[in-house]
Amino acid sequence: LIDHQAGTMLGVQDIKLSEFRSNVLALAKTAKIHNLPTILTASFAEGPNGPLIEELTELFPDAPTIYRPGPISAWDDAQFVQAVEATGRKKLIMSGVTTDICLMFPALQAKAAGYDVYAVYDCSGCWDQMSEMMSCMRMVQAGIKVVNWAAVTADLQADWRKSETAAGTLEVFHQHLPFYNFLSNSQNAVKNGIPGLNTPKIQ
């Protein structure tokens, strides 16, 4: 999770900030549910970029957190690359606060270094939609898999019979996909009846 900082979040204009924040937290919660090794990093946190948003640091109090004093691309920071290598993973799920810089730069570098990179575009953002589209196109051309957080979550769950993660995954969908929550509520009403209306339960 790259540069999701209080200051830089304000620069995202191609998606509502409330939706953007929700997407980032959904991805973070998914990583937590599946016990994925997670790395946080921030650029120039003591300046206008600001601190990492507190929801992330609260979710991952023990995660490696790399504060970069200079490098714009996280992959240009030796500590960040060392933290990635220490996970032992060859597949990387990456998101950065800005798609065209914070995500695309390290994603391209990681791909060139031999990693299988999944770039989560809706947990990243841009100044405008054209910049977002061009950045995603460039990553796809390089062989990076550009996906959204819901696809990542569903892919990791894969089967609702995986009981150790199913409840957590369902909760993430309920919290961060409004239509899914409404659908579930509607189903429960049909199944259990609507209180006060004396509607029959389905046996």
Task: Identify the meaning behind each predicted range.
Residues 23-26, 79, 102-103:
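Well-ordered alpha-helical segments embedded in enzymatic catalytic cores
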Residues 91-149:
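A contiguous pocket-lining binding segment that forms or flanks enzyme active sites
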Residues 69-82:
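Short phosphate-binding loop-to-helix
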Residues 83-90:
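Glycine-rich phosphate-binding loop signature in dinucleotide/nucleotide-binding domains
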Residues 13, 49, 77, 103, ...:
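Alpha-helix N-cap/helix-start motif
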Residues 1-65, 69-70, 86, 133-140, ...:
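Active-site acidic carboxylates
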Residues 52-55, 79, 105-109:
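A short acidic, amphipathic alpha-helical/loop segment
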Residues 45-47, 71-74, 99-103:
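Acidic, metal-coordinating catalytic cores used for nucleic-acid/nucleotide bond scission
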